[in-house]
Amino acid sequence: MDAEMSEIRIEKGCAGELPDILDFANYVFSQSSQPHDFRRLLPKLYGENSGSEGYHYLVREDGRIRAMVCAMPLSLLVAGKPLRAAGIGTVSVHPYARGKGYMKALMNRAMEDLKTQGYAMAFLGGMRQRYEYFGFTPTGTRASFHLTAGNLAHRYPGLSGDGVSLSPLE
């Protein structure tokens, strides 16, 4: 950590801090893309009385949240046996606090805690190349869909397929 980071606090969120955590996430994500409402998008995590404050690792400067990483515990059932996992998300740094190493510090702290606490795995979405620094690699299933003239003929008799195109969903 550099000299600036030695003057900041890294801590877990506490009960009652959900409004501040939610405001911070909504602000940062809304600044970098479209308007966000995490309470609506993820009600189990950010709904009222969800109790999720403690899943959040926070960097504070002068008491104000400047960066955040959520590590939400999940229990997966694999071959009939429970597997402790964590979903990493809401990774965010205030626009004025970028470049200070806060995301790296929070990700390292969260990953170390998960290892120490016996979690078998963690997963996330988002900018995968960014998270490869922390040991994440793309995995999983990929679905491919093929639409042929025969598919169209059975669903839409008389349609030739000329002029039909598919576009990726965004």
Regions found by a protein language model. Name each.
Residues 116-120, 126-145:
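Conserved active-site alpha-helix within GNAT-family acetyltransferase domains
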Residues 2-73, 80-83, 87, 153-170:
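Short amphipathic alpha-helix that is part of the acyltransferase structural core
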Residues 115, 145-155, 162:
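Long, low-complexity intrinsically disordered regions
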Residues 19, 23-27, 104-112, 116, ...:
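A broad, structural surface signal
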Residues 74-76, 96, 129:
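Short coil/turn motifs at secondary-structure junctions
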Residues 111-118, 164-169:
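Long alpha-helical, hydrophobic tracts
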Residues 51, 60-65, 93-98, 115-119:
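Short, solvent-exposed loop/edge-beta patches enriched in aromatic
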Residues 90-93, 99-112, 123:
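Conserved acetyl-CoA-binding loop-helix of GNAT-fold acetyltransferases
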